[in-house]
């Protein structure tokens, strides 16, 4: 008799995606982050749902409703800490997942990669509107500064900014619509993630060598379900350590003060996971130029498959490319650090040099390194 999971119309889909899925036998722990991102998304949706039951999206009561959640709601403090720090864990997994995709050449699955970039942009948008909801000082001024950048768009910029704000400045209408966006976007992310998986299962997973693994595949369960469970234990432990012992470690002290439009904080900055993009934005003295550089820094991921010039897919056996990859990683860490510093020398010039290096590496040095490697590997006799 055929197993129910193989015959039932619904269970059959789950079976093909998570149980009997043929997976390469040599994929490493770097392939854990896809499942960890799924777990992070579930944690964020569940904690967010319970927080939304007690939150009020009104400028007069938003800040006090967050305080009420932390003080008066049963385990409200835990929900809030897990949700806020869960976002940080989400982005840590996201950056590592993208980094793995670049390192091992997974971007050559173009459909999967492009949906992934759209997912990244959607998650960033969700996190941004979510950061505004507690209505603290940094929430308010972060929203004001970032949304004001829309006014740099020629002709329609000011109208567009006022349309999104729902007025002439960030106010009640902005907070209400940002809450609506923050509620609906995670479900759009779930839909995109399903499409991401659909495209991935059309081609099968890549592996560290970058070589076609069809001749040596094993079922996903039990091998990789157990491997993913280990990653899950580390994720939950890290989240609990952060959420229970240092819940405000990654936050901004200014957000403990209610939003005040008449008092500007000395240094406006977003959450740590946006600092690299914020540093790129500030590195260009021109407002429109900064906005374009900010967009280009993320959208450049879409053209990475077109810039692949090497005959080998993965960086596993390519020392020149590995060196450039780790320089790029160090450059992004530098940009993250610069984004958290005040706008003064020497931070301005360091940010500008890091910005130039970022685009130089992706657009020129990496494609040239691929061509050079091809030349070196050609037989010369």
Curated annotation (Swiss-Prot):
- InterPro entries named among the record's database cross-references: Cyt_b/b6_C, Cyt_b/b6_C_sf, Cyt_b/b6_N, Cytb/b6-like_sf, Cytochrome_b, Cytochrome_b_C_euk/bac, Cytochrome_b_N_euk/bac, Di-haem_cyt_TM
Report residues binding heme b b562. 83, 182
Needed cofactors? heme b
Cellular component, GO, one term: respiratory chain complex III
What Pfam families does its record include? Cytochrom_B_C, Cytochrome_B
Chain positions recorded as heme b b566 binding sites: 97, 196
Co-factor note (free text) = Binds 2 heme b groups non-covalently.
Q: Which residues bind a ubiquinone?
A: 201
Q: Between which residues do disulfide bridges form?
A: none
- TM segment ranges: 33-53, 77-98, 113-133, 178-198, 226-246, 288-308, 320-340, 347-367
The processes (GO biological process) annotated in the record are: mitochondrial electron transport, ubiquinol to cytochrome c
Family from the record: Belongs to the cytochrome b family.
Its protein name is Cytochrome b
Per the UniProt record, the lineage of the source organism begins with: Eukaryota, Metazoa, Chordata, Craniata, Vertebrata
């Amino acid at each position: 008799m055929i197993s129910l999971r193989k015959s039932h119309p619904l269970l059959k889909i789950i079976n093909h995606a998570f149980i009997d899925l043929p997976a390469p036998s040599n994929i490493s722990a770097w392939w854990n982050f896809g499942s960890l991102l799924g777990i992070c998304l579930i944690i964020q949706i569940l904690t967010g749902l319970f927080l939304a039951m007690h939150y009020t999206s009104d400028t007069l009561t938003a800040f006090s409703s967050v305080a009420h959640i932390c003080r008066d709601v049963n385990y409200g403090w835990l929900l809030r800490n897990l949700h806020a720090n869960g976002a940080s864990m989400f982005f840590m997994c996201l950056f590592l997942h993208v980094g793995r995709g670049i390192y091992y050449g997974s971007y050559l699955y173009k459909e999967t990669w492009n949906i992934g970039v759209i997912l990244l942009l959607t998650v960033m948008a969700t996190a941004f509107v979510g950061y505004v909801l507690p209505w603290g000082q940094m929430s308010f001024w972060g929203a004001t500064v970032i949304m004001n950048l829309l006014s740099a768009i020629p002709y329609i910029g000011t109208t567009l900014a006022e349309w999104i704000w729902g007025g002439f400045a960030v106010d009640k209408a902005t907070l209400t619509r940002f809450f609506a966006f923050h509620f609906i976007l995670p479900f759009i992310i779930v839909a995109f993630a399903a499409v991401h998986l659909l495209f991935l299962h059309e081609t099968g997973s890549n592996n560290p060598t970058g070589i076609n693994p069809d001749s040596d595949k094993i079922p996903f369960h039990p091998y990789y379900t157990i491997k993913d469970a280990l990653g899950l234990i580390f994720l939950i432990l890290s989240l609990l350590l952060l959420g229970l012992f240092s819940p405000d470690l990654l936050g901004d002290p200014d957000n403990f003060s209610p939003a005040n439009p008449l008092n500007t904080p000395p240094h406006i900055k977003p959450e740590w996971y946006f600092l690299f993009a914020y540093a790129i934005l500030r590195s260009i003295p021109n407002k429109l130029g900064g906005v374009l550089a900010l967009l280009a820094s993320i959208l450049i991921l879409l053209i990475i498959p077109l810039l692949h010039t090497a005959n080998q897919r993965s960086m596993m056996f390519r020392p020149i490319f590995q060196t450039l990859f780790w320089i790029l990683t160090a450059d992004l860490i530098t940009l993250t650090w610069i984004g958290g510093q005040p706008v003064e020398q020497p931070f301005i010039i360091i940010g500008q040099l890091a910005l130039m290096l970022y685009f130089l590496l992706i657009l020129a040095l990496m494609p040239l390194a691929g061509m050079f490697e091809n030349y070196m590997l050609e037989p010369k006799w």
